[in-house]
Amino acid sequence: MQQHLSKTAYVYSDKLLQYRFHDQHPFNQMRLKLTTELLLNANLLSPEQIVQPRIATDDELMLIHKYDYVEAIKHASHGIISEDEAMKYGLNDEENGQFKHMHRHSATIVGGALTLADLIMSGKALNGCHLGGGLHHAQPGRASGFCIYNDIAITAQYLAKEYNQRVLIIDTDAHHGDGTQWSFYADNHVTTYSIHETGKFLFPGSGHYTERGEDIGYGHTVNVPLEPYTEDSSFLECFKLTVEPVVKSFKPDIILSVNGVDIHYRDPLTHLNCTLHSLYEIPYFVKYLADTYTNGKIIMFGGGGYNIWRVVPRAWSHVFLSLIDQPIQSGYLPLEWINKWKHYSSELLPKRWEDRLNDYTYVPRTKEISEKNKKLALHIASWYESTRQ
C-alpha cells in the first residue's frame, strides 16, 4: 500500500482506538473512527491513502520524554506501579488514569506521526493527516491533560534531529499546547505558536502572551490567548493577524498543525463560541501557509474535541479535505453513515455538513470581546515583528 501513495497519507488503524482511559472518560477515540468512516462513506478518502502506524521505539520516545517516565508508563501498562510513583508521573487521577497496554497504545500514536514524517521526508508523500494524534499536554516527565506521550513534540524533534528541519508547530486547540511549548522553550530550531482560550479560566492555565521562550529560544514561542465566548470572526481575525508573520519570518521547512476542534460552541469542556465556519476555515488557511512557505510540507494532527457526534467528524473531515485540495462541503451527509451511527449516538446526529445553529447563543459582549482580542493580537504581531529586526 505504501508504495503507491498519493500525495496525502492518512494514518488510521483500529489499534489507535485502544488509547482509552475508561468508558466515561471525555477523551474518546471513537471520534477517529467516526471521522474516517464519514470520509470513506462520502467517497472523499480512498483506502489507498490510508497508512498503518508503527510503534515508536523507546529511543524515539526519549527524544522528548525522560527515561524514568517511559519506564513508569511501561509499569503502569501492567498494573505494577506504586501509588507514589503514579502520583509522581501524573497517573493517579481520573484525568490520566492507567489502562492496560497504555505504553504500546500511546507509542502507536507517536509512531503514526513518525510514519508520516518519514514518508514526507523520503518524498513518498507531500503531506499527511494523523487525526488520532495531537497529544500536546504531555510533559517530558509527566502525563497531563489526557496525554501520555507528546507525539507532536517528538515528531518535531525527530524532524529536527534526523532531517535537519526547521519545524513550526501551529496549535489552534482551545487549550494551550503547554507540553509542546515547554519542550522547546529554549530551542531555536522549533517554533511553537498557540492560539487558545485564555488560561485564566481554562486548563492548563498557561499560554500567556508574555511566555515567549528563553535564551536562544526567545521569540520562538508565540501565544495568542483569547477571551471566553470569542466568536468566529474574532478568532479568525486574530489567527490571521498573528500566524502568518511567524511563518514568514521563521521560514520553517515543515509545519505541524494541531487541529483541536474544541473551540466549537457545543464542546462541553471549553468556553469559546465558534462554529464549524472557523473549524472549516482554519485548516485551509494553514494549508495555504504550507503551500506558500514550506513547499506544501505539513502534517496535520487532531487534538481536543469532546462532542464526538455532532462536531468532531465534520470538522476533522475538513482537516483532511484541506490537504487534498477538496472544497468545503455542503449539503447532506451520507445516509450510510447516519444510519449506522444513529443507533450508537447519545444525541441526534447532524444531517448536513453545515451547522444548524438552532442552539447557538449570541453573547451580548461580543463587540467588547472582539475589540480586546484584536488589541492583544496587534500587540503580539508588533512584538514579534520587533524581535525579527
Swiss-Prot record:
Coiled coil: none annotated. One of its GO terms (molecular function) is histone deacetylase activity. InterPro entries: AcuC, HDAC_PDAC, His_deacetylse, His_deacetylse_dom, His_deacetylse_dom_sf, Ureohydrolase_dom_sf. Keywords: Acetoin catabolism. The gene is acuC. Pathway: Ketone degradation; acetoin degradation. Belongs to the histone deacetylase family. GO terms for biological process: acetoin catabolic process; epigenetic regulation of gene expression. This is Acetoin utilization protein AcuC. Role in growth on acetoin or butanediol. Involved in the breakdown of these compounds used as a carbon source. SUPFAM superfamilies: Arginase/deacetylase. The lineage of its organism: Bacteria, Bacillati, Bacillota, Bacilli, Bacillales.
